[in-house]
């Protein structure tokens, strides 16, 4: 365990997702049992007292890999030297708030954080955005960090990806480990397109194994796309532990690489692949190696999939237009 600690910054660290995430990171779920981690935790001033309590719990776990913890409300201080930033904190949608209000409220947060990352983060920084609306929040942060390569920003669609794998496993009676090449296209919203037409169940085409277009269209896709709302209805609170788990999965695969013969879903900046407008942060199938991602190329997109991809990317374009008009990018 001689390697220098990976400096991991987490925003919204005292929140529900943060509470699940920090213990996963400190226990070695991110980089395994040999790489120590230093946590740098950002919160708003009113939440710092609660965050102190979380740090007390982290101390009480005596995690061998946790080399240190720093907390604060100043992003320029907390992001200093960070190798990985997980932007979890975001303004939730309150009663009577329009989506444009939400974009504006979060715009201020992610503008400031993008600027701070640009100034003080380590040269090898990778930035994962979990706080919603994640795709557009990532776009805002990226646009305010001109010195950081644009491919270093990603928004979380791994939770949708994991949800889709789980639903497909349940339908086919397979194990989750039997399922490969799941894809989420587009926005982390109800318009997202979970695509099983390229996925495999035990090496066989998933759509053919299912053999039921009606299930795909009217059961599978809406269940995955609206899973967050279903959890709120059941639990009385939004999904936190599963979001933390997916945040860890996404960061681990980004840093350590995807397994051979498989890919993952990440929302990354579009280069125009699959007709997704250039410059949008949209979910694609990607492979990763040495901390870099590559969009999987050459997949055939049928008419059904095309219409779904177009719908979700149109929503992303609308969000980009809205934040452009607000002067956030």
Swiss-Prot record:
One of its GO terms (molecular function) is L-malate dehydrogenase (NAD+) activity. The keyword Secreted does not apply. NAD(+) binds at residues 12-18, 106, 113, 130-132. Its EC number is 1.1.1.37. SUPFAM superfamilies: LDH C-terminal domain-like, NAD(P)-binding Rossmann-fold domains. It catalyses: (S)-malate + NAD(+) = oxaloacetate + NADH + H(+). Substrate binds at residues 93, 99, 132, 163. InterPro entries: L-lactate/malate_DH, Lactate/malate_DH_C, Lactate/malate_DH_N, Lactate_DH/Glyco_Ohase_4_C, Malate_DH_AS, Malate_DH_type2, NAD(P)-bd_dom_sf. GO terms for biological process: malate metabolic process; tricarboxylic acid cycle. Keywords: NAD, Oxidoreductase, Tricarboxylic acid cycle. The active site is at residue 188. The keyword Nuclease does not apply. Catalyzes the reversible oxidation of malate to oxaloacetate. Belongs to the LDH/MDH superfamily. MDH type 2 family. This is Malate dehydrogenase. The gene is mdh.
